[in-house]
Amino acid sequence: MLSNARIIAAGCIAAGSLVAAGPCDIYSSGGTPCVAAHSTTRALFSAYTGPLYQVKRGSDGATTAISPLSSGVANAAAQDAFCAGTTCLITIIYDQSGRGNHLTQAPPGGFSGPESNGYDNLASAIGAPVTLNGQKAYGVFVSPGTGYRNNAASGTAKGDAAEGMYAVLDGTHYNGACCFDYGNAETNSRDTGNGHMEAIYFGDSTVWGTGSGKGPWIMADLENGLFSGSSPGNNAGDPSISYRFVTAAIKGQPNQWAIRGGNAASGSLSTFYSGARPQVSGYNPMSKEGAIILGIGGDNSNGAQGTFYEGVMTSGYPSDATENSVQANIVAARYAVAPLTSGPALTVGSSISLRATTACCTTRYIAHSGSTVNTQVVSSSSATALKQQASWTVRAGLANNACFSFESRDTSGSYIRHSNFGLVLNANDGSKLFAEDATFCTQAGINGQGSSIRSWSYPTRYFRHYNNTLYIASNGGVHVFDATAAFNDDVSFVVSGGFA
């Protein structure tokens, strides 16, 4: 009995050590150490206490670094306090490996980004809230046009050298544009030929390779192709993904590579492809360059969307056993969804009106004139038609029911949506794009009054009245309606019962 007790005790110690180890500790034990480790949600080494990411606030341009708590989970409360009463962007995602492979705002390349001088957008600091073992943290919500990069990375694989990588992603946030990637890319932000990349791709693009079903799929961006297997076409063994939290893994070595994936909240990894390199010129041997990208393609293609929580790149080709242990660690982190809304509650099915709080305009309400969404002066004595135009039925968010959509009271089936960053009233065509354009998340009013209403699909952007017309605006940016002056007031609205 004593012998059995000692065996059980030893097993508990071993299990405790495994729980304490981070993904990069596990990779190191497997002989394939992390050369880049990025996460805004948690430490990826058990002993890491440095910064996870940096945020910059809109009010004064100040920055602060967000570090892990003793649990290893990011100190989201520190971010919330720093960003109170303003907006914040994620400016740096720090590399935890010690190699300095930090990710910053991606520069222009083969494609230019939407920001000044062709840079990509930075992500909102609040677009992707989650909990890890019940503790709040924030992921990186990548809207089209958003991207991060390091073109001078240290220790990453070059040429045909072996490497592995994984990422934890939101399996419900994707599109078919190029290319939501994380991994190894060109160092000049341009397409330099077949085989010059090796990165995780997630989405439902059908331009190059595909898997089974309609997608989304985990594939590899190897440059000039998204590959689901050895063929440039279809691999029926690469399944469509439906998990809310997804673990995606890619690894490659001379004439051998693999795609693996699974549910990041439970269970184990499956192998979707393992075999020879694509039998197309340029992929055997590979010509990897060693830059690191997030949310974009190697040439800065920036039309894709997705959400990133954590990921690493390794030196050497990890064994399946090592990756399986990393997956167990991810599952033990207990990723779960967190509320996307705050502030005054809205009731689905209710009729509401939305009054401006800017000093100029406190008698003006969000209304519509045909398809144009604007502000108009409305009161209880206004004509019935105007009162109907200034009233909105709250619906569960068409793209995400944790947020809301706003249906016109006088034009049934038509909703407020954004189009080219303007707000318009359009009939619901049932498309995925419409649903995303018409989904908005409320939060306590940034100026301290009422509510601010941010776009679910572009969480840096909020309902804003500007010259009496409604836009989704960011707190500073390239558009005239992104002006910082009066931003906090212009994006805060008092919600009350609808006029009709």
Swiss-Prot record:
Organism field: Hypocrea jecorina (Trichoderma reesei)
Family: Belongs to the glycosyl hydrolase 54 family.
Superkingdom classification of source: Eukaryota
GO molecular function: alpha-L-arabinofuranosidase activity
Enzyme class: hydrolase
Protein name, per record: Alpha-L-arabinofuranosidase
Pfam families: AbfB, ArabFuran-catal
Signal peptide: 1-21
